[in-house]
Amino acid sequence: MTFYGHEYKAPFECRESFEGMSDGELRSYDAIVVPSAIVSDRLRYSEKLPEPAPAVQFIRRAFAEPGILKGVICHGMWLISPAPELVRGRRVVAHPNLYGDVVNMGAVYTDEDVVVDGDLVTARTGGHCHQFARTIVDLLYERSGEARP
């Protein structure tokens, strides 16, 4: 499946699926990152309402694993919105357009470019992707106990 970016129309190809992933395989991941922009809206689409979309089911499973670092940037919070319990009471940031969504999910909107709340890293916009990525890399090194190169 190929997605195309909204602004620059850059292709993003998905060759693998998270559907049917075993718990052991899921636990083998150090981190998962929810993409920004319209792709997160598309990923939350379900053909069988009220059943949540496969991507939402995957996100719920990933959030249940404290050993997996979760990253959500910008409009990526759209993918979390069908599962508000995942961020309820947690400090997050998202695109300013999603402020109402974040509050309605019960999360604590924090006016910072990047916010870390335990195993969850959120960033305001795609323009903060370098800070977001650096934070995730730093946390992965910290968790591994390895020295940074």
Segments the model singles out, each with a brief description of its role:
Residues G71-C74, R91-H95:
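Short, hydrophobic beta-strand segments that form beta-sheet elements in well-ordered domains
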Residues M1-G67, W78-R88, Y99-P149:
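Extended, subdomain-level signal for the structured scaffold at the beginning of enzyme domains
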